[in-house]
Amino acid sequence: MTDSVSKHLPRDLSTVFLDRDGVLNEKMPEGSYVTSWNSFHVRPGVPEAIARLNRAGLRVIVVSNQRGIALGLYTAEDVEAIHLAFQQLLSDHGAHIDAFFLCPHDHDQCNCRKPLPGLFEQAVAQFPTISAATSVMIGDSPVDIEFGRRLGITTILIDSNSEHAAPGTESARESADLHFPSLSEAVNALLVRS
């Protein structure tokens, strides 16, 4: 790993925060939502990447804005069913997510919608040993990068050049500490360092 990559990563990495849509599963076109397991298409290499993080002893937490709940497009129970099915798929690969935290609200109605800190605070309440200094935030949008930066967490942009990339991804590339084309490549960098 180059020194320029290594200098951005925490010395004692303990927790990896992951955005969901666009990192773990394929991102839907703007205005469309993952509403069921049938529309949750796992990105290549994701189960194996998460298994590698688990084997390295790292805590893996998903933090996700799920505005579609507030819009009435799906329910919190629908999201839970998706996450249970995803955990089963991960289990088949010797992997797991330690916790899922999601914001079910529309814009400006809460403190938990990324980039606000509420999802991080929920994670710390459940796992008191979490520290921003030993965490990494991996996401595919400017909101994910801003979330991490506001908290002082190292940020990694998954820049897959998807046709469904979030607006502002170019500026997120500039402000992220690091960027990689896939979760697998980001995990490679993390595990070489830790």
Stretches with model-predicted labels:
Residues 34-41, 74-81, 114-115:
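Alpha-helix N-cap and loop-to-helix initiation/capping positions
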Residues 114-148:
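Conserved Lys-Pro-Asp/Glu-containing loop-to-beta segment of HAD-superfamily phosphomonoesterases
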Residues 177-186:
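Short acidic-hydrophobic, aromatic-tinged amphipathic segments that line or gate anion-handling sites
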Residues 137-178:
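Acidic, Mg2+-coordinating phosphoryl-transfer loop and its flanking beta/alpha structural elements
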Residues 2-61:
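Active-site neighborhood of HAD-like aspartate-dependent phosphohydrolases
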